[in-house]
Amino acid sequence: IENLALIPGSVGAAPIQNIGAYGVELKEVFVECSAINIKTLNSKIFSLKDCKFNYRDSIFKNQEINKYIITSVKLKLTKKGYHKLSTNYGDINKLLGKSIPNPKSIAEAVIKIRKSKLPDPKKIGNVGSFFKNPIINKNLLKKILIKYSDIPYYFVDGAYKIPAAWLIEKLNFKGYRKGNTGVHKDQALILVNYGNSSGIEILKLSEHIQNEVYKNFSIKLIPEVVVW
C-alpha cells in the first residue's frame, strides 16, 4: 500500500473508488469491508468478490451507490521478505536512484512526487484526478497513431491504456483558465477552483474537455469523480 501514500480521503472511501496510484490498486490487498445500510441501519460485510472492483470503480459507485456507509476495511499485508515492491511506474525509480527500495522509501518517493505535481486542496480547490485513463482497442490505437505517433500507451489485459493527461495536454488545456475555473498548470488531469467557481462551471469545463478529446481522438473520457 506504500504506492497509495498521500491519496486524499478517508479509509472508508478507498473501497468505493478502488483507489490506485503508481501501478497499485486497493483490490490487490483488500479482504473485506464492513458497511451500514443508510436506510435500515443494518451492518453488512462485503468481500473482495462482493465489491466488484474495477478500474477506479466498485459496486458502491453502481448497484449500491449512496446506500452504505463504510465503517471499517480489512487489508491483507505481507511480511518482510515476501513483499512485492512496485517501482516501475512514474518517477519512483528515478527518485530512488541506486538505493535498494523498501516500503518506506517507496512511500517517501510517492509522497515527494505527489507533493511536487498535485495542488494542495486546502489552498486550491480540486478533487485530484478528474478523469480515468481511457482503455481502447487495437484498431482505434492504430488510427490515432497515424496522426499522433507520439501518443503513449500501455498494454493491459488485451487492450491499451492511454494517459488521459496526455490527451488533455495535447489539446493545450494544461494551464487553461476561464474565470475562476481551470486546468492545473502542472497536472492536466486536475480541474481547479481558483476561488468562487460553482460546481456547474467545473462540470461545464469537464464536458468541454470531454467533447474536444472525443472530437480529436474518438476517445470518451470518463470522469473518475462522483458528481452529486
Regions found by a protein language model. Name each.
Residues 43-200, 216-228:
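Phosphate/pyrophosphate- and phosphate-bearing ligand-binding catalytic cores of soluble enzymes
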Residues 1-34:
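A gly/ser-rich beta-alpha-beta helix-loop segment of oxidoreductase catalytic cores
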